[in-house]
Amino acid sequence: MSLLIGYFLGSIPSAYLVTRRLTGRDIRQMGGGNMGGLNTFREVGVGAGAAVVLMDLAKGALAVSVAYYLLIQNAQWVILTGFAAVIGHNWPIWLDFKGGKGLGPAFGAMLFLLPVYGLPQHLLILALLVFIPLAITRNIALATGIALFSLPFLVWYGSHSEFATLISVLLFLMIGIKFVLDNRKNLRDPANRRNLIVDHWKRPDKNS
């Protein structure tokens, strides 16, 4: 039950709904085609992008909150529910299983999981691992990738839980593989490969 709830909450297509409501267009046909906050920010606007980010974070946080408080699941099932929310975001049943990369619901779940299971300081470390690379590179994808890569080490150091560490590794691999698959055309071009590392956060000039 909790896994289904996690999947269906994660599969709510936030970027699609916000963009369709504001512009009447399909976010999958705009910009890079990704169903996430960054593409919405770049193609629709700051407010729309912020709304999508908050909604995606909420999907992950709500999924694990329901499993923890309402269904009273043990830690393993709560963690798996958060993982299911990321799967739902990446492969939503409502849009032919074509979704985003899972960063929003993943970090949303961690906003709940880390403090609840006694690792609030690791949440601060994770935030620093996002914001410091972001300040240097201006690339939210690279910054969150660094944080996700570090997550298994943080989880193991803080909890020594083999299960939680394994899920952290699988989360990093799933999001990383989804990123590579969704950007395989760009990765073939040296100029585009550079853009995936620097200046990825900048919103394009619509007049250029």
Swiss-Prot record:
The chain crosses the membrane at residues 52-72, 77-97, 112-132, 140-160, 161-181. InterPro entries: G3P_acylTferase_PlsY. It comes from the Bacteria. GO terms for biological process: phospholipid biosynthetic process. Its main location: membrane. It is found in: Cell membrane. It catalyses: an acyl phosphate + sn-glycerol 3-phosphate = a 1-acyl-sn-glycero-3-phosphate + phosphate. It is an enzyme of class 2 (transferase). Pfam families: G3P_acyltransf. It is a multi-pass membrane protein. Pathway: Lipid metabolism; phospholipid metabolism. GO terms for molecular function: acyl-phosphate glycerol-3-phosphate acyltransferase activity. Keywords: Cell membrane, Lipid biosynthesis, Lipid metabolism, Membrane, Phospholipid biosynthesis, Phospholipid metabolism, Transferase, Transmembrane, Transmembrane helix. GO terms for cellular component: plasma membrane. Its EC number is 2.3.1.275. Catalyzes the transfer of an acyl group from acyl-phosphate (acyl-PO(4)) to glycerol-3-phosphate (G3P) to form lysophosphatidic acid (LPA). This enzyme utilizes acyl-phosphate as fatty acyl donor, but not acyl-CoA or acyl-ACP. NCBIfam families: PRK14416.1. Probably interacts with PlsX. Belongs to the PlsY family. This is Glycerol-3-phosphate acyltransferase 1. It comes from Dehalococcoides mccartyi (strain ATCC BAA-2266 / KCTC 15142 / 195). The lineage of its organism: Bacteria, Bacillati, Chloroflexota, Dehalococcoidia, Dehalococcoidales.
